[in-house]
């Protein structure tokens, strides 16, 4: 049975509402992400997540309203199935609760509105208006009588809805107007000649009728409506802003900025502290504007002022204290500070970022020695980025101290139960800091000095501080400072217990007890690094590319072991792993490698050497004291953490990529467990013990469409939108951009011809060349009828060079490698090319039904996904491309991937997914040529790309085997796996019990939500929803017990509650 869960949940925000939802004294922001509502509190100039609610439907709009006698606002949610319901905050249970359960306003005989579903609330809280179908409005009256509100049980906040007809069919936008006598609305629409008009209506709730009003305006620009508190309405067009009302003649303002179109807008609520005459608007290019309207008795003057640039907005929410929330589909959503919004000096400041990786047009899995990373082509237009998603350790900054030039630092606990001393080592000085139990910092002048500090620890039972600088060894007992001054410069040092070891210039290693010398050892070359372990063993790295092991005891110092390396050791750390008699020696080299030698009983375990390349420059190794694991920091171009988990080495990235050095730091009063520094600051931080997904953003010129990679570079196909301010014309330019993996910087690019759009890219088998497919999209053509196949290779001086070019008759929509051949989907055909001796030639081709969208291959099959006609199975036999099977159902495919032999996974534009089977053993030829539908279900999002890959390797006892990874338009990454024959019955029963025991929001059915949705029918779902099953882990014990026992007419499961928790924990290991 197919098992689907989220690796990364949807992050695109298309709708948001600002209201007093949780209590009457504080503000909340509620955002909608596909089928999830997130409730945030607005406190201390930040948005903090309170809770989230998974809705078993796709949310198309959400609005707030305040029922009579309710101290808080309720929200009404409209879904894509033309239904609505309401939610409110239950103060007794501190949770989101159902108000009115699902109400259906669908009419199958009517045509859907071209403007999409519109949900509107009357400013005076009298009615809610829903526009779904052409020529029809659904009116939902809000209770205004307290007596009727108290006696109503079925609909505690709203009356039954009724429908009214309007003449306008092609509606552009609708707005509820400020009219105190009757609920009124303005309708912006197009007539049959595409001329834009505005009409107004008044709603008669008692008679359930709608009457035309006398405020009309003809032949205006198409745009967005914003109601004014003066009773009129603003129309934001492409060139003009109009004001239309009954009292003032039509006024218009010529826009002074080259704006293509206004998208979202917001009228500022007086309670937010902003002038009610000021409106914040955004255009499709991501620019924010302040629009101000000043009214006199008969006229209105309008001003438009640019504020700055932000993410391309899907929704705007004005907040108190000149703050603005920008919800975005194309980039990160942000909380902005708009200082002095009523004055002329504006500066946008980002206060908070909400990561969004939507829309994902393509992605790859990049596997290296540090683990797997997902690299996505995200965003669009100016907001295009590459997003690198890693399963990494998160580091949360608690406090930042601005300081530059830090070389190293140390922390020690001196006669305290916390780390009360911090040493900051700069290039030519050391600053010592004392930290009080309350977290107050003060300087210690006794330990501060005019040279760098190399090492700090405590000796003699924590009674003295040991400080090794470049000139001396110092001991401090809290009052007096004792020192041993070196005749030569000290290059490195270490200690264990009361024993101290330093290396000085000339390759001499000195041993001390305290500051009393007890022995010395002369090396052949200079010492690059050393580490004193608890077995009285010193590991010494030499500039001659050697490591020697010196044993220190009362009888003297002896050389017990040596290792010959190929590179110079630069940093050494020894960590216990096997118990008292063994451990691992970590050695970083000058070229970015980390070597690991396993030792036991003082000897290297044979064949235990492991080499991991973590960069190209020297790496600093630092031991980190953790209660959970013995961890080693590797600080280089990409800071990473190394530790063993279940006898398996784990190398995981860190969320902070600017980290230069670290130190363990335990201080309960500050709530931190580490210090780290960057080029510009020191951070007191808290490192999580649990890995989670972290997203790194790489800026791209333009927006990325396709990506592939080899061991050194990312090859990214980008498109860049250029505008001419004078003519307002736009044109798309295409590029191949090459990014170096370690630095993530662009090192080369190739510009394609005008009107040439990049469509596909693959890496060839030699791991050096890439093949790019394009199509020419000329303005006078509906579809491309020409394109090119090109082969590129990186030169020795890191330039990109075209090696071959082949012109084709159409757009190269998709490319894959099939053995040593190149398979291309070109318009309505599949072609096989061969690249030999710098030329590309056609081996064979075949026609497909309409338009090839995607191709997947295995050893003997080529699967072509069609725009309208599902998939076709092809084989390449004796230089002939032949069709062996086809799905004859109409299906608008978006991606295809081979699940297993003769089993194919297909996604379609409506959010459905189908698994198809090919029967190649049937005696009937017609059966062998016809693909059979095996499983079908609804995913809820449009899938752009599906790949056969695994982000996290499953464990041996995993209940589900991951098979595919799907990327969606709304920024989610879905894992598609197989639950196996033995696990399927239990998981299906568990899913059914959860559906029956846990009440859904709005009374929606999860079973209906996951049903396959065809043209005129729905079919039962063949799916185990991992998100539903995993969501119950945090529920109370009685509810889990009810699920196990089959409450509400469910099936009793043959497991305990503890077994249920273990099952869910097992399933959660598929993703962070």
UniProtKB/Swiss-Prot annotation:
It comes from the Eukaryota. InterPro entries: Beta-prop_RSE1/DDB1/CPSF1_1st, Cleavage/polyA-sp_fac_asu_C, Quinoprotein_ADH-like_sf, RSE1/DDB1/CFT1/CPSF1, WD40/YVTN_repeat-like_dom_sf. It is found in: Nucleus. Keywords: Cell cycle, DNA damage, DNA repair, DNA-binding, Nucleus, Ubl conjugation pathway. One of its GO terms (molecular function) is DNA binding. SUPFAM superfamilies: Quinoprotein alcohol dehydrogenase-like (SSF50998). Pathway: Protein modification; protein ubiquitination. One of its GO terms (cellular component) is Cul4-RING E3 ubiquitin ligase complex. One of its GO terms (biological process) is transcription-coupled nucleotide-excision repair. It holds the Pfam family Beta-prop_RSE1_2nd. Component of an E3 ubiquitin-protein ligase that includes cul4. Required for ubiquitination and the subsequent degradation of the DNA replication licensing factor cdt1 and of the ribonucleotide reductase inhibitor spd1. Also required for transcription-coupled nucleotide excision repair. PANTHER family: DNA REPAIR/RNA PROCESSING CPSF FAMILY (PTHR10644). Interacts with csn1, csn2, cdt2, ckn1, iqw1 and wdr21. Belongs to the DDB1 family. This is DNA damage-binding protein 1. It comes from Schizosaccharomyces pombe (strain 972 / ATCC 24843).
